[in-house]
């Protein structure tokens, strides 16, 4: 099946007998979402969840076999899209525009990693990570922004708790996700006054192919211990957070989605530690009561 082909499903049913097709919204009403990096891991899980719930998904991937697999899912059209290739991004925009469904949501999910000490990381590997993880969302968001603004829709970017934590040997990946955090915050400040809600999803340790792909790139092979993430749970909770960010009337700016309390404790603890460092022996510092007052005010705004 051509990767850009629309899948037309025609159901014949006796009067008064409901079928699965009856639950799918008509094209004009069926909200559409573009998901990058949809071939596996979080992207695949998000694609399947959205399609199952009756939304239409433009599922972006690079490899022909992945495109065919995505096309086999009801309510999904695959799009060949490498987020590092502007010409493929432009072609994807044109395809979505011509399809006539509009675009309610964008999920920037495509991501890569490399491992190793920063002082030993090759510049080309660092550029590779930033090209996909930082410039990728920037390119795709910039290209699809007119369609999202037109629909008053949502932009959701998959960040990571690594965008808050900074731990070896994932320094390059963590650098890129810190940049994604700034990207999301700035985008929200720019677009929310125009009616577009922006969210960041910060997953912890879930099952995905990112470690395997990183292991292969670093010459460690697909079967190295570092590549094995089978001990981690499937990212169902991450998909739930994405759906909430895309369609809830009151989406959150940030969704920290972790499989265990320890990861949450480490992440929140790191944010608090940075707060203490910012306040410690500085030209303008605040005592405990003043900090608690600031915290209470922030908690009040989040209600």
Language model features with spans:
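Residue(s) in the substrate-gating loop at a strand-loop-helix junction
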Residues: 160
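The beta1-alpha1 cofactor-binding region of Rossmann-like NAD(H)/NADP(H)-dependent oxidoreductases
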Residues: 81-91, 123
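Conserved glycine-rich cofactor-binding loop
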Residues: 39-40
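Active-site loop-to-helix junction immediately N-terminal to the catalytic Tyr of the SDR YXXXK motif
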Residues: 121, 166-174, 186
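SDR active-site lid
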Residues: 193-256
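Substrate-binding pocket helix/loop in short-chain dehydrogenase/reductase
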Residues: 117-118, 125-127
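Active-site helix of classical SDR
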Residues: 141, 176
């Amino acid at each position: 099946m051509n990767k850009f082909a629309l899948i037309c499903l025609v159901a014949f049913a006796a009067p008064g007998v409901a079928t699965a097709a009856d639950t799918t919204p008509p094209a004009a009403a069926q909200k559409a979402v573009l998901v990058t990096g949809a071939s596996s891991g979080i992207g695949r899980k998000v694609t399947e969840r959205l399609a199952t719930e009756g939304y239409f998904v433009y599922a972006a991937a690079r490899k022909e076999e992945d495109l065919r697999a995505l096309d086999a899912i009801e309510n999904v059209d695959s799009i060949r899209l490498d987020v590092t290739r502007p010409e493929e991004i432009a072609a994807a925009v044109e395809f979505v525009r011509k399809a006539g469904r509009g675009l309610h949501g964008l999920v920037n999910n495509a991501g890569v990693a490399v491992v190793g000490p920063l002082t030993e990381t090759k510049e080309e590997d660092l550029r590779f990570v930033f090209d996909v993880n930082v410039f990728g969302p920037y390119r795709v968001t910039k290209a699809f922004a007119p369609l999202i603004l037109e629909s008053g829709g949502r932009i959701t970017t998959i960040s990571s708790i690594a965008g808050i934590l900074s731990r070896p040997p994932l320094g390059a990946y963590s650098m890129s996700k810190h940049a994604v955090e700034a990207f999301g915050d700035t985008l929200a400040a720019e677009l929310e006054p125009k009616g577009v809600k922006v969210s960041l999803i910060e997953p912890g340790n879930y099952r995905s192919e990112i470690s395997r792909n990183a292991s292969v790139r670093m010459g460690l092979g697909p079967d190295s211990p570092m590549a094995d993430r089978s001990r981690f749970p499937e990212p169902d909770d991450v998909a739930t957070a994405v759906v909430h960010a895309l369609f809830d009337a009151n989406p959150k700016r940030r969704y920290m989605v972790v499989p265990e309390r320890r990861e949450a404790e480490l992440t929140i603890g790191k944010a608090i530690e940075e707060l203490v460092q910012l306040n410690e022996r500085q030209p303008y510092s605040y005592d405990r009561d003043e900090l608690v007052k600031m915290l209470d005010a922030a908690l009040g705004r989040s209600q």
